[in-house]
Curated annotation (Swiss-Prot):
Superkingdom, natural source: Bacteria
Residues the entry annotates as binding ATP: 162-217
Function as written in the Swiss-Prot or TrEMBL entry: Cell wall formation.
Binding site for Mg(2+) 1: 288, 302
Pathway where it operates: Cell wall biogenesis; peptidoglycan biosynthesis
Gene name tied to this protein: ddl
Organism of origin: Clostridium acetobutylicum (strain ATCC 824 / DSM 792 / JCM 1419 / IAM 19013 / LMG 5710 / NBRC 13948 / NRRL B-527 / VKM B-1787 / 2291 / W)
Protein name, UniProt field: D-alanine--D-alanine ligase
Localization in the cell: Cytoplasm
Amino acid sequence: MKKKVAILFGGQSTEHEVSRVSAASVLRNIDTSKYDLFPIGITKKGEWFEYTGSADKIENGEWEKDEFYKSPNGQAILFNKEVDVVFPVMHGLYGEDGTIQGLCKLVGVPCVGPSVLSSSVCMDKVYTKYVLEHFNIKQADYVVVHAHEYKTSKEEIIKEIENKLGYAVFIKPSNSGSSVGITKAHNRKELEAGLEEAMKYDRKILVEEALNAREIEVAVLGNEEPKAAIPGEIVPAKEFYDYEAKYENAASKLLIPANLSNENLEKIKNIAIEVYKALDCSGMSRVDFLVDKDTTEMYLNEVNTIPGFTSISMYPKLWAAAGKDYSKLIDELIELAASRNNA
């Protein structure tokens, strides 16, 4: 008997469009001889719809206007437990932060990817740092800025950043993905502008020292005994791998494997698995590192619990390089969700 799988996409986060592209890619690659599919789209207004039309219309956003294939029973499918597994392809807030995971837990339907707690901690860059400090995972130096404190103590906070980190620094909303709202500052003027920009997306901001580093990504898969694929390297077309470089600039390159020694490839895989376990991840995550260009010292950058699944995304590409094609990867993720739920 075929498993019934709900593919959730869209949502109210700033990564709505990326989610649509990822979902379309999953729908094109999933083995329909094994699964009955229930694509469920969530609009930017928070409306839920089942959509049975083409993946192309999901990708380009036309699905919302396609009344023939759209029905308003998206929530009912989940709440009535009409599916066996939920595969959330929703990046960022409300999809990757434990919200959808908690909803699935509440209604008793297995969900692909990490648990509520793991998802919420990994989504919050500041709390990820707090947890991994306990496990002695090397990370870039940082300062946390709260919006309400910045309004009343701006000068003191700016001086703290300058004294502790110097320039250049990266300014990041704590709860945001796909590099949305991230800027790089080389001086005080750019720092102030970057903080204002980041506060459009979150009230808690992470300011990190800008390392002279390469960006290395490791795909991890599994529950109690996770495995890591061969690491890949991002060569951004711009100064850093921002939203435009990730999704709109074809000049950015993905190198598989990363240009590291065999010893360091194994080392970074082992650290990625250590991070995965420390954060109690399950199902999947992409663990991102910064590797110093001079010393090859490895610094944890962030953990993505629902990594991109587009045709150009690193997570499926890394597993394909390891011999696990896209369709088989989806199969394994669904099985991991079901087995964790039955454990």
